[in-house]
Amino acid sequence: MNRNQMIENIRIACHCGERRAGEYLEAELRSLRELQLRNELRYDDLETACSSLGLEYDCVEYFLAALAA
């Protein structure tokens, strides 16, 4: 799944515009990166990010790839 697909899924789940959905996604990624930098990132943090955005847990793969980049 790519960034545009993630934004579209968030937009649908949150009933918001594309810009707002992108902001939500970036905020979650920032939070996950902070946890990663402190060596405190756990798998359930990725699931929580999905849940917070109204996404299915299969979107964890996107976050893993984004954090690895």
Q: Residue spans of the language-model regions?
A:
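C-terminal end-of-chain micro-motif
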Residues: 1, 68-69
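N-terminal acidic leader/helix
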Residues: 1-27
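Leucine-/aliphatic-rich long alpha-helical segments
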Residues: 7-13, 32, 46-50
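Amphipathic alpha-helical segments that form the core helices of the histone-fold
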Residues: 23-39
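Short, charged early-sequence alpha-helical segments and their helix-coil boundaries
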Residues: 36-68
